[in-house]
Design a protein with these regions (language model features):
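Ligand-binding clefts of soluble mixed alpha/beta catalytic domains
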Residues: 1-154
Length: 154
């Protein structure tokens, strides 16, 4: 299950985390077990990608309708993309709120993630158990061959 806003963005944190995240991602990609992910809240940025996303080989990614999936928090994105417009506007808070809602619907909603192929299906919370069981039943007996490699990238 995924509910992650992202990672701290300081240079010190990036230095600490780069190797750890690379190793974790390598292990996720290399694993041969069935990989099913349910996004219950937020899945932003690199943290959202490495938490068993389609991008690193998840077999199924499901999301609840209220899930927010994208590269960054909608308000942060709006503050970057519309910085000049916000600065020049008399009612900055109203503009930020309006643009944040637009951005969230267009880029970060579960529906937009499904259209992009980032998730396989949107499920209602009451159906979670049933859908997870179905996913694992479909993957029963999954056979995946990982070729032996002489070198890794880590």
């Amino acid at each position: 299950m995924t509910d992650v806003e992202g990672m701290k963005t300081s240079r010190e944190e990036e230095r600490k985390m780069a190797r750890i995240l690379a190793i974790y991602t390598k292990e996720m990609i290399s694993s041969t077990v069935p990989k099913v992910n349910l996004i219950v809240g937020k899945a932003f940025g690199t943290a959202g990608v490495i938490m068993n996303s389609k991008s690193i080989g998840a077999d199924f990614v499901l999301a609840w309708p209220q899930a927010s999936i994208g590269m960054m928090d909608p308000e942060q994105a709006v503050r970057i993309m519309y910085a000049r417009e916000i600065e020049e506007n008399d009612d900055q808070i109203a503009l930020i709120n309006e643009k944040t809602v637009e951005y969230a619907q267009m880029q970060n909603s579960a529906e937009s993630a499904a259209k992009r192929g980032a998730i396989d299906d949107i499920i209602i919370p009451d159906a979670t158990r049933k859908r997870l069981i179905m996913a694992y039943e479909m993957l029963y007996g999954k056979k995946q061959r990982n070729e032996d490699k002489k070198h890794t990238t880590i």
